[in-house]
């Protein structure tokens, strides 16, 4: 089992209870989408799974171990097996794309190799290969400040794929992309997860993309799991209650398909 949560709660430093009573298991190789209204706790949940935030209560198992029972050094080793794709990747503006991508393996390299890579990228061909999968091979030596928001998101994804993690977490990874590119990018992430038996967990606002690309859908509202269903079982009634008091708009679909709904965010 890649992930196991039992009675998890997480309270922020200001006292806000962001996650409450979460019970969840995700097996190796599963592809899971987390959906829900803004402020539901999706990003907090992903940071918890990445061992970036400790739970306030409950039991957490990530890749077979409790991250917060480990020493700092061993927890850092665990994190090298986990990639977290941020909605706005924290990439230095003047950093070149090749360096940003190869930084995905800094947690697996020693200090000397990491410093050398900052001066001269050690695996240009490897970085180019993963960028090519995202149609960014021509941006290899450009600086991050020269890229659009969608291109920066794809660089963040390339960095995560280059890391070769066992657990791939993605927080709104395609929010800055046009619909066609978002669809293509999620298909690529899903195919990578299948080919490499990687566990993929992504938060998405676009419900139709979640239903199209992920076999399992978890709806989160007010820090709680509202439903946990196969994508084929998610109906309008589930989405209506998940997004209660949110403004929803129907997406155009074929006559044979079930109407899917997407929150405006």
Swiss-Prot record:
Q: Name one GO molecular function term.
A: ABC-type phosphonate transporter activity
Catalytic reaction list: phosphonate(out) + ATP + H2O = phosphonate(in) + ADP + phosphate + H(+)
Task: Please name the InterPro entries in this protein's record.
Answer: AAA+_ATPase, ABC_transporter-like_ATP-bd, ABC_transporter-like_CS, MetN_ABC_transporter-like, P-loop_NTPase
GO CC annotation:
plasma membrane
Instruction: Write the Enzyme Commission number(s) for this entry.
Output: 7.3.2.2
Chief location bin: membrane
Note the topology in the membrane.
Peripheral membrane protein
Q: Which residues bind ATP?
A: 36-43
Instruction: Kindly state which keywords UniProt assigns to this record, in alphabetical order.
Output: ATP-binding, Cell inner membrane, Cell membrane, Membrane, Nucleotide-binding, Phosphonate transport, Translocase, Transport
* Positions of the ABC transporter domain: 3-247
SUPFAM superfamilies named in the record: P-loop containing nucleoside triphosphate hydrolases (SSF52540)
* Annotated compartments: Cell inner membrane
Describe, as the record does, how this protein assembles with itself and its partners. Answer: The complex is composed of two ATP-binding proteins (PhnC), two transmembrane proteins (PhnE) and a solute-binding protein (PhnD).
Entry's family note = Belongs to the ABC transporter superfamily. Phosphonates importer (TC 3.A.1.9.1) family.
What is the role of the protein in this entry? Part of the ABC transporter complex PhnCDE involved in phosphonates import. Responsible for energy coupling to the transport system.
Q: Please identify the protein, giving its name as recorded.
A: Phosphonates import ATP-binding protein PhnC 1
Organism encoding this protein? Pseudomonas syringae pv. syringae (strain B728a)
């Amino acid at each position: 089992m890649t992930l196991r949560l039992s009675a998890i709660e997480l309270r922020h430093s200001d006292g806000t209870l962001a996650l409450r009573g979460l019970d969840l298991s995700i097996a190796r190789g599963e592809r899971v989408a987390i959906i829900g209204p803004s402020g539901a706790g999706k990003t907090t949940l992903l940071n918890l799974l990445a061992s970036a935030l400790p739970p306030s209560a409950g039991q957490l198992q990530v890749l077979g171990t409790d991250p917060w029972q480990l020493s700092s050094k061993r927890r850092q080793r665990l994190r090298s097996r986990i990639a977290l794709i941020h909605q706005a990747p924290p990439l230095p503006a003047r950093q070149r794309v090749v360096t940003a991508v190869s930084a995905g393996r800094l947690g697996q390299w020693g200090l000397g190799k990491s410093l050398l890579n900052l001066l001269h990228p050690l695996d240009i061909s490897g970085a180019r290969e993963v960028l090519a999968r995202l149609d960014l091979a021509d941006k290899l030596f450009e600086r991050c400040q020269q890229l659009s928001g969608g291109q920066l998101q794809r660089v963040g994804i390339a960095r995560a794929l280059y890391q070769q993690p066992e657990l791939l977490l993605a927080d709104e990874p395609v929010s800055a992309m046009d619909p066609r590119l978002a669809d293509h990018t999620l298909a690529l992430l899903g195919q990578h997860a299948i080919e490499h038996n990687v566990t993929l967990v992504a938060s998405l606002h676009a419900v139709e993309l979640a239903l199209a690309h992920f076999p399992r859908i978890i709806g989160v509202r007010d820090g709680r799991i509202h439903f946990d269903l196969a994508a084929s079982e998610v109906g309008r009634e589930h989405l209506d209650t998940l997004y209660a008091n949110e403004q929803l708009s129907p997406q155009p679909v074929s006559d044979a398909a079930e109407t899917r709904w997407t929150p405006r965010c």
